[in-house]
């Protein structure tokens, strides 16, 4: 295998060594599926992204995303992190928008100046709403009591490309106490082939609107520090059920505190006609560069 360049970036971070870690491997066209999976397992981040070519196809760059255990059709923080690498190291800073060709389809990423930094925004597919779950099933899965759940809102599967079960809880204390019962979790998560996102309107920091934790054991990720795909699903859920009193959503979500990777995810949702548009944004920091030999 010819030496391949890779970058480490921190996504949804406010500074280096926070947020969600990502490895981005360049010029990966000649890597087999098995080799990509082996590299992702070696990196052992939540996901590793592979830029198949530095040439555009149909206006976008072909990208594949792997967790330590399998390939996924879409994931949020790899989308933003890979777009950052493409903009700075392939387009050399000249692109105002980068389009990724993922298994789920084309995902555009735009760049917004924020002082001497930039916020990356991705527009996700319109959310689809699936199965509604019984409270007692998630209480067993998360080892919580039924009184911890906010019964004003449903526990529901939502997907913008990767499904998540959205679970509303009343308090930050309940979010912190949640502990996955692995066998129950796998039984529940397999019903949607995705993860579980729990949230509360109580937060660690007063400037933030929600606190979130995400569990994705099904893909070899016990707890994810920052989840763009899951928070996109959450945005759709908040809009549909008017959690903030309106279907328009424009909020700050904190995640990752329980795994010592504090993260900030910016979340927007708005209905235009019959289409619910969802955007997720955050900052990206370059941490390291290296070579695979």
Predicted regions and their residues:
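Active-site proximal loop and beta-alpha junction motif in alpha/beta enzyme cores
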Residues: 1-74, 80-293
